[in-house]
Amino acid sequence: MDPETCPCPSGGSCTCADSCKCEGCKCTSCKKSCCSCCPAECEKCAKDCVCKGGEAAEAEAEKCSCCQ
Protein backbone atom coordinates (compact mmCIF):
# COMPACT_ATOMS: atom_id res chain seq x y z
CA MET A 1 0.00 0.00 0.00
CA ASP A 2 1.33 3.42 -0.93
CA PRO A 3 2.16 5.89 1.85
CA GLU A 4 -0.53 8.47 2.38
CA THR A 5 0.09 12.04 1.33
CA CYS A 6 -0.47 14.79 3.84
CA PRO A 7 -2.54 17.80 2.72
CA CYS A 8 0.28 20.14 3.75
CA PRO A 9 3.47 18.84 2.05
CA SER A 10 5.28 22.15 2.48
CA GLY A 11 4.41 22.66 6.15
CA GLY A 12 1.56 24.27 7.99
CA SER A 13 -1.24 22.82 10.05
CA CYS A 14 -3.29 19.80 9.08
CA THR A 15 -5.33 16.99 10.56
CA CYS A 16 -2.38 14.62 10.87
CA ALA A 17 -3.26 12.49 13.90
CA ASP A 18 -1.57 9.70 15.85
CA SER A 19 -2.34 7.30 13.01
CA CYS A 20 -0.49 9.41 10.45
CA LYS A 21 1.34 7.19 7.97
CA CYS A 22 2.51 9.99 5.70
CA GLU A 23 5.96 9.62 4.24
CA GLY A 24 8.06 12.73 4.76
CA CYS A 25 5.27 14.53 6.60
CA LYS A 26 6.03 18.22 7.11
CA CYS A 27 2.82 19.04 8.93
CA THR A 28 3.70 21.23 11.91
CA SER A 29 0.65 19.88 13.74
CA CYS A 30 1.52 16.24 13.11
CA LYS A 31 1.50 14.09 16.23
CA LYS A 32 3.23 11.04 14.79
CA SER A 33 5.28 8.95 17.19
CA CYS A 34 8.42 10.62 15.88
CA CYS A 35 9.53 13.16 13.33
CA SER A 36 11.63 12.01 10.41
CA CYS A 37 14.39 14.43 11.45
CA CYS A 38 14.69 12.88 14.92
CA PRO A 39 16.67 9.79 15.92
CA ALA A 40 14.54 6.72 16.54
CA GLU A 41 15.55 6.60 20.19
CA CYS A 42 14.19 10.10 20.87
CA GLU A 43 11.37 9.46 23.32
CA LYS A 44 10.55 13.14 23.74
CA CYS A 45 9.32 13.16 20.17
CA ALA A 46 5.91 11.73 20.95
CA LYS A 47 3.83 14.86 20.41
CA ASP A 48 3.86 18.31 18.85
CA CYS A 49 7.37 18.09 17.45
CA VAL A 50 8.19 20.43 14.60
CA CYS A 51 10.95 19.63 12.14
CA LYS A 52 13.07 22.67 11.40
CA GLY A 53 15.12 22.71 8.22
CA GLY A 54 14.30 22.36 4.55
CA GLU A 55 14.87 19.50 2.16
CA ALA A 56 18.01 21.22 0.93
CA ALA A 57 19.53 21.13 4.41
CA GLU A 58 21.99 18.45 5.41
CA ALA A 59 20.51 15.66 7.53
CA GLU A 60 22.66 16.71 10.46
CA ALA A 61 21.46 20.30 10.10
CA GLU A 62 17.83 19.37 10.54
CA LYS A 63 16.64 19.96 14.05
CA CYS A 64 13.49 18.98 15.84
CA SER A 65 11.80 21.32 18.29
CA CYS A 66 11.54 18.59 20.93
CA CYS A 67 14.97 17.07 20.33
CA GLN A 68 17.60 19.68 21.13
UniProtKB/Swiss-Prot annotation:
Keywords: Acetylation, Copper, Metal-binding, Metal-thiolate cluster, Phosphoprotein, Zinc. The modification Phosphoserine is found at residue 33. InterPro entries: Metalthion_dom_sf, Metalthion_dom_sf_vert, Metalthion_vert, Metalthion_vert_metal_BS. A divalent metal cation 1 binds at residues 6, 8, 22, 25. The keyword Phosphoprotein applies. It comes from the Eukaryota. GO terms for cellular component: astrocyte end-foot; axon; cytoplasm; cytosol; dendritic spine; extracellular space; inclusion body; microtubule. A divalent metal cation 3 binds at residues 16, 20, 25, 30. Residues 31-68 are annotated as: Alpha. The modification N-acetylmethionine is found at residue 1. Abundant in a subset of astrocytes in the normal human brain, but greatly reduced in the Alzheimer disease (AD) brain. A divalent metal cation 7 binds at residues 51, 64, 66-67. A divalent metal cation 5 binds at residues 35, 37-38, 51. This is Metallothionein-3. A divalent metal cation 6 binds at residues 38, 42, 45, 67.
